[in-house]
Amino acid sequence: SMKKKFQLEVPGGADKVLLHTCCAPCSSAIIECMMQHHITPVIYYCNPNIYPLEEYMIRKDECTRYAQSLGLEIIDADYDHENWRCHIAGMEQEPERGGRCLRCFKLRLLETARYAHEHGLSVITTTLASSRWKSLEQINEAGQYATASYPDVTYWEQNWRKGGLSERRIAIIKAVSYTHLRAHE
């Protein structure tokens, strides 16, 4: 085809990336793409915003199953919904793409950057950017904010909506029966 081949340029040429993952459907196409480019994602599940706990467990278990099926490492950050509530206090009524989203992204990506720093991983990125409901600008701002505290960690600003990945994500979602499709397109 004439379509320009989708190129992945990892900061510093890292071959291992800490991937903050919001859920299996969003991460599947990204993980597949990384692996095709010989980049190994270490999956970091840090989503204290998900409520109730049952929903959190369902999503976490799906991510874990998916990671294990590919032989990938998955790290479960502790579920701390109370801490999350404290962080977004007073912003509960904010709309999608509002101030609460930015604060939530910052909290989750700061945790991701901290884990990367403590475990010798030099690059982080997130599957949050795959959803067209989220603001790419907010996600990138949160990623830069998160890595500012850790000079040894770089935030990889990759637009995961390009290169046919959105279509691939939808195809994977259709092929794999995920339980919480209601949260997606």
Predicted regions and their residues:
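ATP-dependent adenylation/nucleotidyltransferase module used to activate substrates
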Residues: S1-G163
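Short, surface-exposed amphipathic charged segments that create phosphate/polyanion-binding patches used
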Residues: I88-P95, E167-S177
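Conserved small/polar residues in nucleotide/adenosyl-binding loops
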Residues: T179-E185
